[in-house]
Amino acid sequence: MVKLPLPPGTFPTLWNADKRYKENYMTNYEGYYQTYDAGHIDDDGYIWIMSRTDDIINVAGHRLSTGAIEEVLSEHQSVAECAVLGIADKLKGQLPIGLVVLKSGVDKDNETISKECVQMVRDKIGPVAAFKVVIVIKRLPKTRSGKILRGTIRKIADNVEYKIPPTIDDPAILTEIKEDLIQHKILNNG
């Protein structure tokens, strides 16, 4: 949340959606703008935005924060950045999968890193997360401002039609993600 008034340079509304803007961002807590971001301030005073508070998945009736799972994955010594998303599952509703980008110079094999990441989530969050899949990828699709395109990745994984966002940094990454999901049998090739 950000205390009002908003600083110069922030948008006072959404294009053609002033009412929706006020309902979604200005009415939850009087005098504050609701960002739906979660983060922390480190010892040096830097603000770290870690996840969205509205990115909750439903795994067999349990509401889980993908941000909490991402936080665990980011603690792995070989992980540079990651994204967790819930993919559709007929039995459990959704299942979390992790996509991780490794730091340069990592000499462990991808399978070992994936197993270690799965075990870390099991140890810190518990078996209720049903977290069993970590895919090591080269890079994550992002907007030019650095936001990871989780919604687009989720649509690709669920084999749902998606549009390439106009703000994407490099559209070729989406093809790479699709190929990785097919290779790991998350997405059906046909």
How should these model regions be labeled?
Residues E161-D169:
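A short N-terminal helical cap/helix-turn-helix that marks the beginning
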Residues A83-V84, I135, E161:
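Residues embedded in well-ordered beta-strands within globular domains across many folds
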Residues E179, L187-G190:
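C-terminal low-complexity, glycine/proline- and small-hydrophobic-enriched intrinsically disordered tails
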Residues R52, I137-R139, G151:
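Short, loop-centered acidic/histidine patches that primarily coordinate divalent metals
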Residues P5-P7, P12-T13, R20-E23, G31, ...:
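AMP-binding/adenylate-forming catalytic core of the ANL superfamily
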Residues V134-R144:
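Short proline/glycine- and acidic-rich turn/helix-capping motifs at secondary-structure junctions
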